[in-house]
Curated annotation (Swiss-Prot):
Intrachain disulfide bonds: none
MF GO annotations: neuropeptide hormone activity
Modified residues (Leucine amide): 17
The protein's name: Pyrokinin-5
Role according to the record: Mediates visceral muscle contractile activity (myotropic activity).
Keywords: Amidation, Neuropeptide, Secreted
Any GO CC annotation of this UniProt entry: extracellular region
Compartments, as annotated in UniProt: Secreted
Length: 17
């Protein structure tokens, strides 16, 4: 969902940003 290690649903950034 937000600046993490890429979620399945609702990817805001994807990798860690």
């Amino acid at each position: 969902g937000g600046g993490g290690s890429g979620e399945t649903s609702g990817m805001w950034f994807g990798p860690r940003l």
